UniProtKB/Swiss-Prot annotation:
Belongs to the MoaC family. It comes from Beijerinckia indica subsp. indica (strain ATCC 9039 / DSM 1715 / NCIMB 8712). Pathway: Cofactor biosynthesis; molybdopterin biosynthesis. Homohexamer; trimer of dimers. This is Cyclic pyranopterin monophosphate synthase. The keyword Lyase applies. Pfam families: MoaC. It catalyses: (8S)-3',8-cyclo-7,8-dihydroguanosine 5'-triphosphate = cyclic pyranopterin phosphate + diphosphate. Keywords: Lyase, Molybdenum cofactor biosynthesis.
């Protein structure tokens, strides 16, 4: 098992020094689900939710969150993101939304935290905008699906 990169040999927290690492294109994709009642999903898709366009607002919130990841997660490097995308797919079989976020950068460190932050905040925004009608919603399965680039190369989660 690898050692923890954000701790010194004395257990003190540090931001990892990436100055000697090569700049490479890096991509990360994260996913999550928001499970809700079917009536809540229908309301979200109708565009008639009291707080407005639920899907568009959650998408923008996720993108904004990715850009602020370094302000939210201690020791995260600020990155010049080259792309952030958030997709919210309605899934009646849940019922709810399947949410995916993609983050890209040409840099010296990965974008996993940015993709995870984007998907998390998009889900939290769905929850916030719909909680008045459905207090039983659940956010589930937040995780990294895939990463590409950097010294460790590509990684993809196997189907469960």
């Amino acid at each position: 098992m690898s050692s923890l990169t954000h701790l010194t040999s004395h257990g003190e927290a540090v931001m990892v020094d990436v100055s000697d690492k090569a700049e490479t294109e890096r991509v990360a994709i994260a996913e999550a689900r928001v499970v809700m009642r079917m009536e809540t999903l229908e309301l979200a898709l109708s565009g008639n939710a009291e707080k407005g366009d639920v899907v568009a607002t959650a998408r923008i919130a996720g993108i904004m969150a990715a850009k602020k990841t370094h302000e939210l997660i201690p020791l995260c490097h600020p990155l010049l993101l080259t792309k952030v995308g958030v997709d919210l797919e309605p899934d009646p079989s849940l019922p709810g939304f399947r949410v995916q976020a993609l983050a890209k950068v040409k840099g010296q460190t990965g974008v996993e935290m940015e993709a995870l932050t984007a998907v998390s905040v998009a889900c939290l925004t769905l929850y916030d905008m719909l909680k008045a009608v459905d207090r039983f919603m659940r956010i589930e399965g937040i995780g990294l699906l895939e990463k590409q680039g950097g010294k460790s190369g590509s990684w993809k989660r196997e189907k469960e």
